[in-house]
Each structure stands twice: as C-alpha cells, then as structure tokens.
From Swiss-Prot:
GO terms for cellular component: cytosolic small ribosomal subunit. The gene is rpsR. Pfam families: Ribosomal_S18. Binds as a heterodimer with protein bS6 to the central domain of the 16S rRNA, where it helps stabilize the platform of the 30S subunit. The lineage of its organism: Bacteria, Bacillati, Actinomycetota, Actinomycetes, Micrococcales. GO terms for biological process: translation. This is Small ribosomal subunit protein bS18. Keywords: Ribonucleoprotein, Ribosomal protein, RNA-binding, rRNA-binding. Part of the 30S ribosomal subunit. Forms a tight heterodimer with protein bS6. InterPro entries: Ribosomal_bS18 (IPR001648), Ribosomal_bS18_CS (IPR018275), Ribosomal_bS18_sf (IPR036870).
Amino acid sequence: MAKPVLRKPKKKSNPLKSAKIEAIDYKDTVLLRKFISDRGKIRARRVTGVSVQEQRAIAKAVKNAREMALLPYSSSAR
C-alpha cells in the first residue's frame, strides 16, 4: 500500500525581518513579550519563525530582562 503524500507546512515569515528590526535589546520589553508565552516561557523557533541566531539573541535578551526585573520569570495568572 502506498504512503499518502505529506505536504510540507508553510514556512512562517520572520517577524523581525518584516518589522525591520536588526538589534534585539533586553530593554525593549514590548518586543520581547511577543516571544514569551502566557505562562512566561520563551517560545520555540518553530512557533515564532525566527532564525537560529535571532532565537539565541532573543533568549539572552529575555534572560537579561528577567534578571533586571523588566520581565517576570513566570506568569502572574494562577
């Protein structure tokens, strides 16, 4: 029996490229909140559509912002 042909999912567009953002800064909490889930976890690359290098920079910026108390470590909702 033949296997059904699986279609590849459509690649997500890079939100940083479409917004023309080159530098990711830990002080830009409005931008960083787009990459954090409602539970306070950093969203995966496959969800956000950013490149490997940008994902690393986002993760570092989020961790720095959390350390500086600009972003919460977890969600406030319980």
